[in-house]
């Protein structure tokens, strides 16, 4: 929503950010016994950092070229970075869900569903807050007319990077 709908940038690489968020979150919960909520925050940071890194060279691209670059990123992440032949840091077994905050058990499907809905609502409220902020208005202005936004002293490069980063962070949480 942030990158395609608000910024008007076509990205086919969201699955790469989802995969990075999933791998980082799985590593945190399975091997380091990090709480699931904290691992979601770490996954969001990992997805945001990856999106920032992908966004840097893609700043000058638009349309089909941007879509191709982001698709190549997604394919390289899923085929190379997350391949256990090359990297052994990704857990390969089922991950046991630790209790939330050490108290709330989410092992049953119903409780995990409720937890997922709560996370969805939190992400929705956060993204909605960004949408109604100065940053959200700048992203929308960039989508409508990049030159007009630049004439109103909106830093186009930083706004594009912000849109990429927010989009990657949300995708990281989805992982």
Description of each model-found segment:
Residues 1-175:
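Transmembrane alpha-helices and adjacent helix-loop boundaries
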């Amino acid at each position: 929503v942030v990158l395609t709908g608000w910024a008007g940038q076509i990205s086919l690489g969201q699955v790469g950010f989802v995969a990075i968020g999933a791998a980082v979150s799985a590593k945190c919960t399975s091997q380091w016994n990090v709480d699931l909520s904290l691992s979601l925050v770490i996954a969001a940071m990992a997805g945001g950092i990856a999106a920032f890194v992908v966004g840097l060279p893609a700043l000058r691209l638009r349309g089909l070229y941007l879509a191709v670059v982001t698709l190549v990123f997604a394919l390289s992440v899923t085929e190379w970075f997350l391949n256990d032949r090359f990297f052994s840091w990704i857990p390969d077994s089922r991950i046991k869900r630790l209790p939330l905050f050490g108290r709330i058990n989410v092992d049953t499907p119903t409780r995990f569903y409720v937890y997922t809905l709560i996370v969805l609502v939190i992400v929705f409220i956060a993204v909605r807050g960004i949408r109604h902020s100065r940053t959200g208005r700048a992203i929308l202005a960039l989508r409508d007319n990049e030159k007009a936004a630049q004439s109103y002293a909106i830093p186009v490069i930083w706004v594009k990077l912000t849109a990429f980063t927010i989009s990657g962070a949300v995708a990281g949480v989805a992982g």
